[in-house]
């Protein structure tokens, strides 16, 4: 299949299922699987997946400078368990003992290996997933599966160097680790922004306030005689082609590295980092610089998404990423996040109301990002029933060299209470297609990169996906909630049919996520706690999948709310449980028994389902 070729799904031509009368907004469950008809499963606020804990640039947003807690359950405890007796990191590997920076007497961690090993809880059964994957375990003596790679007689760690070399060939490693030196210069404000400095100076000189726009034409005439070219040259960009690409949306918290790696294994072509905030990046915050990291298998096809409200910050971040990372395919500007805190700071969807500022930010990014192309994600508008994306896209195409535009078919105000407007997405797609056609006709611009257009919203099956990509003007579809609730959605797209995964197959997917999570966060007590927490976050979406075999009609709709149901076996029922305590039980199948002090409170509450009329 060529890049621009449209594919058709055989499933689209299949006859409709037998009509079943079901109240609007309700999922049609076969009667024998309904447990309690009058009890409706809780709905969820999926906007939190776009904002999550993000949004506090300075770290001070509440009264008294305290950082506000994001999410609807603001009292949830995010602290992870630490060991009561901690082993000094200099002693993790008995074969490679390092010098402790504090010395045995001053160090807060113990230097008594025997005391530490005696204090550890009983090892989790089985083989350490990290040792199995890469031939050694970086957690060393702290590993919760220590017995699988530790010789008690020699008191040394077991290492499989052959497996280590094989893992490198298999591209099983993480990339985009910004050096301590570069982050140190950022922290001390000593980083040399050779390109961004010129870009910022030039854009500052051209800034006009929106209120003076009426005088812009006259002012432009006066400036024609003194016009000066920009003091920088934009580098030639990598080419992007999103036609028919399987794209996973940027997602905060749940869109972490292990999840993205899982999605690549399940057929995704393009993934994005969690949204990174520009100011914390410039402040060299460790937590923020962890976000652009990726697994090697994500590249090519990996984008870093940033949020900002200032062109100077955008320029600097773009230059840092282009200079300090080697595995980034695109830089994506978030103009769709609806979270109030970001909106009040002028970031995310607030930029939809400030097109002049948005244009400046994109210009700054494009001029400072080296060969990395710049893309943007927007919504239909800020207010409900007032679509502005069409006008905005026309301006972006005319004033910027944007490699791709993604449109989420909802306004900021609308959120997830109604279905995405794919008719409007198609309208905007026509604008982009006409723009590309004009460029093709113009011999001077024929060789320049075409602008890709991607739709986003409510895609939950191969039928939804093909309905979208078979629409003129739409190059591909970005999938968000659909890929969280049903991670194998791209396998359905490739097979062009529904895949009714069994409980065992779904457990295999969770097992893979668990292994990837441990490789990323580590197999010590702290890493296992993080893996468990993020697995619970993942389960807060996957439990919403309703097995096809218990539905009375197809296609399934992502916004439909089911009555309380039971599965075809006990495991399927457990995987569909809305009780977070059951989610913790599921994690224990892969991560061992959780401690009594482990608490997980779901971040998402109600609202994402369309209210029935």
From Swiss-Prot:
Signal peptide residue numbers: none
Pfam families to which the protein is assigned, alphabetical: Dus (PF01207)
Positions of the UniProt region annotated as Disordered: 1-24, 40-78
GO cellular component: cytoplasm; nuclear periphery
GO terms assigned for molecular function: flavin adenine dinucleotide binding; mRNA dihydrouridine synthase activity; RNA binding; tRNA-dihydrouridine47 synthase activity; zinc ion binding
Cofactor: FMN
Intracellular or extracellular location(s): Cytoplasm; Nucleus
Basic and acidic residues biased stretches: 51-61
Record flagged with keyword Nucleus: yes
GO biological process, one term: mRNA processing
Cited function: Catalyzes the synthesis of dihydrouridine, a modified base found in the D-loop of most tRNAs. Specifically modifies U47 in cytoplasmic tRNAs. Catalyzes the synthesis of dihydrouridine in some mRNAs, thereby affecting their translation.
PANTHER family: TRNA-DIHYDROURIDINE(47) SYNTHASE [NAD(P)(+)]-LIKE
Identification of the protein by name: tRNA-dihydrouridine(47) synthase [NAD(P)(+)]
């Amino acid at each position: 299949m060529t890049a621009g070729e449209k594919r058709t799904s055989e499933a689209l031509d299949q006859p409709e299922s037998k009509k079943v009368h079901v109240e609007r907004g309700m999922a049609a469950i076969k009667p024998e699987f309904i447990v309690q008809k009058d009890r409706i499963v809780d709905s969820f606020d999926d906007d939190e997946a776009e904002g999550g804990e993000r949004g506090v640039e300075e770290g001070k947003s509440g009264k008294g400078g305290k950082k506000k807690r994001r999410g609807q359950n603001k009292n949830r405890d995010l602290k992870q368990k630490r060991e009561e007796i901690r082993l000094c990191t200099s002693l993790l590997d008995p074969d490679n003992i390092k010098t402790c920076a504090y010395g045995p007497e001053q160090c807060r961690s113990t230097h008594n290996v025997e005391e530490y090993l005696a204090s550890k809880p009983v090892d989790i059964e089985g083989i350490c997933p990290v040792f199995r994957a890469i031939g050694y375990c970086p957690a060393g003596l702290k590993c919760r599966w220590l017995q699988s790679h530790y010789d008690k007689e020699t008191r040394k760690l077991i290492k499989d160097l052959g497996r280590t070399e094989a893992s490198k060939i298999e591209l099983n490693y993480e990339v985009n680790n910004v050096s301590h030196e570069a982050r140190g210069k950022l922290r001390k404000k000593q980083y040399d922004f050779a390109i961004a400095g010129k870009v910022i100076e030039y854009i500052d000189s051209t800034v006009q306030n929106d209120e003076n726009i009426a005088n812009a034409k006259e002012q432009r005439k006066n400036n024609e005689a003194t016009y000066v070219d920009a003091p920088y040259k934009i580098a030639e960009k990598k080419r992007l082609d999103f036609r028919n690409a399987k794209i996973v949306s940027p997602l905060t918290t749940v869109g972490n590295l292990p999840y993205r790696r899982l999605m690549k294994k399940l057929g995704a072509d393009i993934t994005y980092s969690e949204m990174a905030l520009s100011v914390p990046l410039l402040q060299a915050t460790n937590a923020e610089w962890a976000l652009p990291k990726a697994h090697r298998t994500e590249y090519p096809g990996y984008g870093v998404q940033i949020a900002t409200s200032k062109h100077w910050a955008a320029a600097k971040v773009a230059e840092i990423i282009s200079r300090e990372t080697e595995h980034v395919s695109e830089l994506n500007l978030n103009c769709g996040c609806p979270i109030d805190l970001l909106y009040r700071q002028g970031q995310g969807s607030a930029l939809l109301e400030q097109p002049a500022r948005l244009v400046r930010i994109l210009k700054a990014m494009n001029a400072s990002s080296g060969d990395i192309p710049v893309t943007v994600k927007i919504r239909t508008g800020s207010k409900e029933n007032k679509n502005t994306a069409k006008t905005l896209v026309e301006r972006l195409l005319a004033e910027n060299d944007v490699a791709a535009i993604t449109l989420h078919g909802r306004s900021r105000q609308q959120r997830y209470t109604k279905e995405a407007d794919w008719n409007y997405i198609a309208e905007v797609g026509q604008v982009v297609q006409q723009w590309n056609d004009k460029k093709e006709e113009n011999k001077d611009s024929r060789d320049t990169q075409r602008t890709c257009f991607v739709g986003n919203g409510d895609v939950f099956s191969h039928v939804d996906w093909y309905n979208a990509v078979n629409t003129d003007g739409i190059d591909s579809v970005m999938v968000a909630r659909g890929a969280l609730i049903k991670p194998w959605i791209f396998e359905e797209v490739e097979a062009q049919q529904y895949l009714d995964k069994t409980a065992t197959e779904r457990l295999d997917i969770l097992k893979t996520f668990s292994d990837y999570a441990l490789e990323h966060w580590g197999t010590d007590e702290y890493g296992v706690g993080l893996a468990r927490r993020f697995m619970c976050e993942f389960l807060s979406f996957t439990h919403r999948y309703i097995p096809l075999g218990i539905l009375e009609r197809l296609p399934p709709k992502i916004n439909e709310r089911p009555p309380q149901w039971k599965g075809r076996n006990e495991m399927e029922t457990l995987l569909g449980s809305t009780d977070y305590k059951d989610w913790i039980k599921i994690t224990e199948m892969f991560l061992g028994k959780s401690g009594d002090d482990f608490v997980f409170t779901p971040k998402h509450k109600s609202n994402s389902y369309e209210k029935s009329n």
